[in-house]
């Protein structure tokens, strides 16, 4: 990990909020099928209806591409590939229903894993810093603020911190799937339920 020590917090606080939504997709793998849309502001109930009413055999290739295009793969692993800021999703379909999966994507702050949650650090001079606590020693907290760049770790002096609390806001941002149309969303959900396995039954059965 690379540790950055700055006298000011502006740079880190900026990359720790909604500005991440506009991150460039230059890191998306070559050959990725990008969403055609038109997208919408997906809500859980509407998304459930769209997925449940989809017909035909789902596309593994498009589902895998949507996983990359919506930046899921930047934070989550699937079959050993992807980021580490969030939980491994390879077994997601064996543990959660379609509704659970959609809800976790659309309303990420509703349920937050203790392992991947963030901490709010309230500063003595005023203001606060939000980040995932990686480790700490007698002098510093070491935190990651950008889920798309977990190797960027900031050392925050304990002398500057008045108190801390667990954040009620997920590091995962809402709206990541809002560029997808209903077919693209259905393929993404199929890919998640299949755990990235192209031979899964979801790709051989029709509704």
Which residues does each PLM region occupy?
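The canonical Cys-X-X-Cys-His
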Residues: 63, 69-79, 89, 188-195
